[in-house]
């Protein structure tokens, strides 16, 4: 697999993971390393900016197009990444009204 997914630089997603993949907690150590090391190739193949050169890359492109399910560790990791960045994150609070809680609490009378 040395020739497959060759890249010249590491992959960082500062928009979704400003502190890095390993510090965010969504990925295992191995998944973080794979995303950083091969993420540029994954992204280019997924967006069609790069032509697949090997059988592994051709299979990866077929997975990205939805022609087959994720089977390899690389495909499962990229699928997890795409799912995480495209899913809206929910934030839960203990307050009934977030704007009221942020304004300092108008229920307090101070008497």
Swiss-Prot record:
Belongs to the MaoP family. It comes from the Bacteria. Involved in the organization of the Ori region of the chromosome into a macrodomain (MD). It constrains DNA mobility in the Ori macrodomain and limits long-distance DNA interactions with other chromosomal regions. This is Macrodomain Ori protein. Disruption phenotype: Disruption of the gene causes a slight decrease in transformation efficiency.
């Amino acid at each position: 697999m040395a020739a497959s997914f060759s890249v010249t630089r590491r992959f960082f997603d500062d928009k979704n993971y400003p502190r890095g993949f390993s510090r965010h907690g969504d990925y295992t150590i191995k998944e973080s390393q794979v995303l950083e090391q091969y993420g540029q190739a994954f992204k280019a193949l997924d967006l069609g900016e790069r032509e697949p050169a090997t059988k592994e890359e051709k299979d990866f492109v077929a997975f990205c197009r939805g022609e087959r399910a994720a089977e390899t560790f690389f495909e499962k990791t990229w699928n997890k990444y795409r799912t995480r960045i495209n899913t809206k994150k929910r934030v839960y609070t203990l307050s009934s009204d977030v704007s009221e809680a942020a304004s300092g609490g108008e229920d307090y009378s101070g008497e």
